[in-house]
């Protein structure tokens, strides 16, 4: 017996970027395949507080953006428990402060985010000339005063690509061009996701990657630094986007299907209505399963996406009937969220992974 799964969750990585970009665009943006969860709803509530009008008709989110120059006088931004939302918003908070004459903006959250050290986000802000203080260094709440003043900014992306994404979303709003140099970039697929979101909302920038042949412990082919050249004075334009299904969730079902199939419990599993050009890092699970000996096949889904992004949706089948899965080797530097499910997969493979 085979099993089919339709991943109802929208990718938080895709949705949070799209929601913030829609807020910065003056006019209506429509985000299809909207499936609310705490982190996505948190982003929606943030932009509502900035003056955006929000409506939902089932699975489509309608956002009437106010535009970057008309952001509300936000004195406090609440990011819930989302590390991504916090890091995306810290550079934007500095821009809001600058628009409001340098008035302080406080970023806070609740729950686990208050125990997370975000020192790299604070260091990046200070490198950009922003005054950022905290009751306890590196921990929320942050008090951010003044805008980004430096036109050449450099910091490490080793600990998080999310801070880089936050700067890439804010720098186009500045009056002058900025050069951002990111050393030791990590989670590069998520940077690609940010860049695609920016393109969809009319933002342009250039980038150049530099390589050192794998020195410093990096895998050959991984850039040692990326230099982004960001023109200033840009405006976000409204857009219609399809929010891709969440590959982080899909990875668990794909592994479960492969393992259960190899044990003869089921024939396999089919993940319905997935996108193979999503740029989500966790899509790599398909290549990993192939390397373990599982069969991964792709067939067109019976639905398509109205032309907001290239590529239609696919049904993806994973089977390993009557075969033991083989040990694998993978570098998860750029897809760290896969670590837990990869440990489960390794436990069901012959040999040492």
Regions found by a protein language model. Give the residues of each.
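Structural preference for solvent-exposed beta-strand-turn elements
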Residues: 3-4, 8-353
